[in-house]
Amino acid sequence: MKLPIKFAFASIFLFLAAGCATPRIVRNIVEPAIPSYHQDINGVPMRRVAVLPIDFDQQTESTPNELDLVFHAELTKTSAFEVIPISREELHAHFGIPQLSSVEIIPSDLLVRLVQDYGVDGVLFTDVTHYFPYRPIAIGVRCKLVDAHTGVQRWVFDHLFDSGAPQVAIAAKQFAVDQESEQSPIATDGADILDSPTQFGKYVAHETYRSLLGI
């Protein structure tokens, strides 16, 4: 059966248009890992915060202290509030414990003592919930910021940073590139961060505490 002339021309036009059209390019854009968090915006601003030692369960002496330094440094860079580090020795001297998890019951006099001795508005608990220092490096972090006067949680955070995930690896390398560009004019792709638990820990701390802004 012959098609009417107008339909034949229409079919030819569609065929030619389809052949000349530029194919649509689909790009998979990987976004940096931005963990979810919660904050209570009704509380008064935090100006001085006591930062407790990181709660770390693995049997090692050096790693917790190294993580304390790394996390304190990145927290200070946020300028979210004045950071008052509480050492493991101080915590043990006052309360008989070297560290305290964010999910443990807070000793009844801890907040009162910290307010009296250090004049703080809040207390920050940080736990390393997972630590795998070999490639692919993975570090899990759980945090809680508590109002030192009321005991109310002002901010909570719980996230696993796994460098085996492409979006995490990309974000970590970009962090390393940004850090290197501030210190050295030598170009780098930032890939070394994926082999260093200390450097990757800096990225983890940066991303964790970045969400504190606005508290």
Regions found by a protein language model. Give the residues of each.
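Sec-dependent bacterial lipoprotein signal peptides
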Residues: 1-18
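C-terminal/domain-edge helix-coil "capping" segments
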Residues: 20-45, 110, 114-117, 136-138, ...
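N-terminal segment of the mature soluble domain
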Residues: 46-52, 58-123, 202, 207-215
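Soluble periplasmic/extracytoplasmic beta-strand elements of cell-envelope proteins
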Residues: 48-53, 123-127, 140-144, 156
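Solvent-exposed loop/turn segments connecting transmembrane beta-strands
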Residues: 60-62, 130-137
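Feature marks short, surface-exposed loop/turn motifs that line or immediately flank catalytic pockets
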Residues: 92, 132, 163
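Residues that line or immediately flank small-molecule/substrate-binding pockets and catalytic motifs
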Residues: 127-130, 161
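Beta-strand elements of well-folded, non-transmembrane domains
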Residues: 130-132, 145-149
